Amino acid sequence: MNLSAEKPNRRPIRLCSAVYDAIDSEAAYRGEKAGTIANRILADELDKVAKIGIKHCVVYGSNKYRSMTVTDREGEEWYILPAKEEIEKHLPSKSVGGKSKQVSFYLSDKHIALLEEIVRLQNIIKTVDLDGKIHTLRFAVVGLLLNNKLIRETGDYEC
């Protein structure tokens, strides 16, 4: 998916300080901006999902994940999204003084459609209205970022 082929949609998402700091550190090392690195990471993860297909995406710990046999997991490529609890640990704190940084993600229509499919797959309360309208993409975005090697290597800490 080529982001430059169509006008990107800007979606600002707040990242917790730990996730942002990992991205910012990589950006400093590469001499780039944190937003550029964050957008590249998200695009890479979305491309992996697109290549594998949404039908081969599963949320860790979900009924579908638990029903998969070892053969299912080893025989085909799967994209395993973090569980809701893991994602929530890495969302910005709403407490007073909770530090977070906003990153503007520039997404193609195809990427937004794929993120919306991921939101529906995650099935997290308050992300989709009763009428089926997507309320927020942040759980999907943070889940994909957490699957990236750079973010995973930063360790298991809460924001």
Residue ranges and their predicted role:
Residues 1, 120, 157-159:
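Short intrinsically disordered terminal tails
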